[in-house]
């Protein structure tokens, strides 16, 4: 398999608890798993066939493992194949496999876990993980994400004390255990997917944006073109993008005022991991409920949160390229332009990874920077801005 670059409505009724192997190994437990954050990704320890490894927690995806690592841990291909789309809507057919004796924490023990067999993905290697762990691994338990202590609390078979079934938001049915539920803006609901694999607060598809724009609950702030990021299948074809200001939304009684999000076609509408800064998220998978317990009940104003640069840079085709460009630079910078320096620092010898780019921009304290572009045989500087 070739290397890939990465970086990555009906409601359920009350469901009976599933009878699984786990129910015969533990009647009731509460467990705590410490996690780490790397470049906005939640990374958790997992044991497969008594071998330690790490996965990205991705509540919006299905469990997927670099097959080279899976084989080392005793993984076996099933002979089945599955067509799976990445974050950009680009689809490919992957082989399916089984991982033996998967242990998450001290008590969540799965005799086997189905996984998508992935090629060698450099971005995963850079993060020190073997893949992504989806909701399918937690389908029989209640999971709470507590960002204040960087812990995952696993409850089986009941929810944490104080959380009532009727207080939760019902989840839409999902064969892949995605966490989908309605989120309301000015009285109009759109279906969102809670996805810990996306660091941002919100992204939105074009259809949902148009629905909210009709009731004046969404206003375009900036226009751009490009891609929101690299998925398992690499960069998507450039598309029209928007940065949009939304009306407030409420979760768990907490108001989020003036949120912004990026809008593109062919992407899901996502509530990302940034929401964990503001409260505890609990997912009751067996009963299909989503809970949000805010750390503070006071409203939060997001009007100045998460500014973005007027270009984004990603590794592609053996070099660092412009992946996204926003107004007013659309007529001066082309998608695919090679970037050879940032603030005069040569980046052509850096490892071709998104992490290398992130490290450079994380060190910039001002809201302005200069990039050097090489277009054919010509080099020129462009000032870019964070806003």
Predicted feature locations:
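Pepsin/retropepsin-fold aspartyl endopeptidases
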Residues: 21-387
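Bacterial Sec-dependent N-terminal signal peptides
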Residues: 1-26
């Amino acid at each position: 398999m070739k290397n890939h670059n990465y970086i990555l409505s009906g409601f359920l009724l009350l469901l009976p608890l599933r009878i699984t192997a786990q129910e015969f190994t533990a009647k009731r437990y509460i467990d705590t798993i410490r996690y780490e954050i790397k470049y906005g990704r939640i990374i958790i320890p997992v044991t497969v066939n008594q071998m330690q490894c790490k996965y990205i927690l991705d509540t919006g995806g299905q469990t997927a493992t670099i097959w080279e690592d899976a084989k080392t841990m005793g993984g076996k291909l099933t002979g089945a194949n599955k067509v799976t789309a990445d974050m950009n809507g680009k689809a490919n057919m992957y082989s399916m496999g089984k991982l033996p004796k998967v242990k998450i924490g001290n008590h969540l023990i799965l005799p086997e876990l189905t996984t998508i067999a992935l090629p060698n993905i450099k971005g995963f290697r850079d993060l020190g993980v073997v893949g992504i762990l989806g909701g399918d691994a937690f389908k029989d338990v209640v999971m709470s994400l507590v960002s204040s202590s960087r812990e995952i609390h696993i409850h089986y078979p009941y929810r944490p004390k104080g959380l009532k079934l009727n207080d939760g938001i019902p989840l839409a049915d999902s064969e892949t255990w995605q966490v989908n539920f309605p989120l309301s803006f000015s009285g109009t609901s759109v279906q969102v997917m809670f996805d810990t694999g996306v660091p941002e607060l919100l992204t939105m598809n074009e259809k949902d944006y148009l629905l909210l724009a009709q009731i004046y609950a969404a206003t375009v702030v900036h226009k751009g073109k490009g891609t929101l990021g690299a998925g398992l299948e690499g960069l998507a074809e450039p598309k029209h993008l928007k940065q949009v200001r939304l009306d407030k939304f409420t979760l768990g009684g907490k108001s989020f005022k003036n949120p912004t999000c990026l809008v593109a076609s062919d992407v899901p509408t996502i509530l990302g991991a940034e929401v964990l800064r503001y409260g505890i998220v609990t997912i009751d998978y067996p009963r299909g409920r989503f809970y949000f317990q805010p750390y503070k009940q006071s409203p939060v104003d997001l009007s100045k949160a998460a500014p973005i640069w007027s270009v984004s840079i990603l590794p592609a085709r053996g070099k660092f390229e412009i992946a996204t460009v926003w107004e007013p630079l659309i007529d001066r910078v082309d998608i695919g332009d090679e970037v050879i320096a940032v603030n005069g620092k040569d980046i052509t010898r850096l490892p071709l990874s998104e992490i290398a780019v992130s490290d450079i921009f994380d060190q910039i304290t001002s809201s302005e920077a200069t990039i050097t572009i090489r277009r054919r045989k010509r080099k020129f500087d462009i000032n870019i801005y964070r806003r």
